[in-house]
Amino acid sequence: QKYDTIQLPITVSNHDIKYKYLKDYHEYNPKKIPIQSAVGIINGLWANSMGQGGIIPIEASYFPSTSFMELKLTGLQGDVMKESMTVAKTLASSLVDTDTMTKNIERFEKTKNQGIHIHCPEGSVPKDGPSAGTAITCCIYSLLTGRNIKNNIAITGEINLQGYVTAIGGLNLKILGGLKGGVTEFIFPKENKKDYDDFIELYKDNNLLLNIRFH
């Protein structure tokens, strides 16, 4: 019986990987920050078990509704993330000053256009987990008050109804992914300080963090 022989060592080029072995897979392109600052648009952050991370764009806008601040959610959001949306709406509305909220209610009574539509683009990518809670809260608050959110900022952190922000996982992957997307300012939970310190120690001699701010 005749067998094929294999020449060792085997040389595999980047071209082979991309166009031969992985030709049926789509190349991942990091999501970029918005072109400009705007009301109701914020950068959340994600990380997964595959060692990847990046930006989750979160958008909030009004839509016609007979119920004040009725939520409409789109963008393939999981159950945990949907719960975060509900918590965020309750918290954000409690943070808005009385005069502004009164004006929103008066506007609703006239227009019936104050339902809140929250959308996470890239609908083909499933999104779940509570770590976007803080970003969603800020996004809804921005919509209710008409205040712009800086387009270069990204925020991560689980949040409860009292406004306490708690720890999240994968901070290092989220920061690295955010940097690829153009983020220059990160906001993260105090409970993740050790993760942050470890990250800074690892990259302290790298120009990667030049002019990058953390809060």
Could you say what each language-model-derived stretch is?
Residues 4-215:
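Peripheral, non-AAA+ core regions of ATP-driven protein-machinery
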